From Swiss-Prot:
Sequence intervals crossing the membrane: none
Family: Belongs to the thioester dehydratase family. FabZ subfamily.
EC number in record: 4.2.1.59
Record localization: Cytoplasm
Active site: 59
Protein's recorded name: 3-hydroxyacyl-[acyl-carrier-protein] dehydratase FabZ
Name of the gene encoding the protein in the UniProt record: fabZ
Pfam family, one: FabA
């Protein structure tokens, strides 16, 4: 990390490193890079939106728009990046337990870069976490809301 700005990384964390922490793979790997990271508190992720993504075939023909649920999922994956590195929660998988106060403010289309800032609100007993997220394109809010996560045990 650099000392210029708390959380600023000397080099962005690439998708190959993200995939060591998260189970998501194409077509549901929705974070291309982590740009900023403050352990246990906050991460900023980037998703490059390309026309080649499978959901654009049907959403919406001749006017491709990234589905809102995938914007929320992308923010959740940034949240998962934070959670899976917290002490005692390594090698864990956190699933959605709920979403609140989600709003979609502008469309996200091929060619955009969705910048997602996700911050931890609370973590309880290393099992339940609440976070707030905001996704922007060109400095404009595209999606925002709160996400609730629950730790799953696969045994």
């Amino acid at each position: 990390m650099t000392t210029e700005h708390p959380g600023t990384l000397a080099q962005p964390i690439p998708v190959e490193e993200i995939q060591k922490l998260l189970p998501h793979r194409y077509p549901f790997s929705l974070v291309d890079r982590i740009l900023e990271y403050i352990p246990g508190e906050k991460a900023v992720g980037l998703k490059n939106i390309t026309f080649n993504e499978p959901h654009f075939q049907g959403h919406i023909p001749n006017h491709p728009i990234m589905p809102g649920v995938l914007m929320v999922e992308a923010m959740a994956q940034v949240g998962g990046f934070i959670l899976t590195q917290m002490p005692g929660m390594e090698d864990s998988f956190f699933a959605f337990a709920g979403i609140d106060k989600v709003r979609f403010r502008r469309p996200v289309v091929p060619g955009d870069q969705l910048i997602m800032t996700v911050e931890v609100i609370t973590v309880k007993a290393k099992r339940i976490a609440k976070m707030k997220g905001c996704g922007t394109v060109d400095g404009q809010v595209a999606v925002e809301g709160e996400m609730l996560f629950s730790r799953l045990n696969f045994e």
